[in-house]
Amino acid sequence: MRVAGAAKLVVAVAVFLLTFYVISQVFEIKMDASLGNLFARSALDAVVRSTKPPRYKCGISKACPEKHFAFKMASGAANVVGPKICLEDNVLMSGVKNNVGRGINVALVNGKTGELIDTRFFDMWGGNVAPFIEFLKAIQDGTIVLMGTYDDGATKLNDEARRLIAELGSTSITHLGFRDNWVFCGGKGIKTKSPFEQHIKNNKDTNKYEGWPEVVEMEGCIPQKQD
């Protein structure tokens, strides 16, 4: 009886040890697989991050150099979608912000700091050009001026208003016409014509929309004003 009991004990211990060994081996395999998957996922994530194209301020195509402000803007689309003006990744004017309107939309920015000074829109179809002229005259030297049309930005423009905008660096303002699409970035006190201007004429033969040309867009890097 003692021999039989001892034999049972030996068998029980052997079964326990075998079971423990098998479980430990399976657990180790699962741990190795889990760690392998973890490392594989980490490597894949690193590859995705390294191949994902970088995003620059305002969604422009390349980074701006130091002491420059990134900007991107678009004119309105027909009389349906308002213009959009972005500077340094901050949307200054848009339909979502509910601060755009028919006519010429204007954002004024401090040329040294990039801080927003004011946003306005002036109805050049059914409005009066006089408030727009007074607004243009009051712009201080060193101010960055960004403009974009929506619907019609030209009907009420007179020679004085066009001259004041030309003094900000615009070339196209002299022949901006009814329902043309136009975006412009210039500055008060600028000594040369601005390189930042796009203009599409309203032409029934080439218009993208019925009665309006396609949206005009522009992006770039504005030099920061230095003392």
From Swiss-Prot:
Q: Name one GO biological process term.
A: neutrophil differentiation
- GO cellular-component terms in the record? cytoplasmic vesicle; extracellular space; Golgi apparatus
Residues forming the GG-type lectin domain are 67-225
InterPro entries recorded: FAM3, ILEI/PANDER_dom, ILEI_FAM3C
Pfam families tied to this protein:
ILEI
Q: Which residues form the signal peptide?
A: 1-24
At the top level, the lineage of the source is Eukaryota
Protein's name in the database: Protein FAM3C
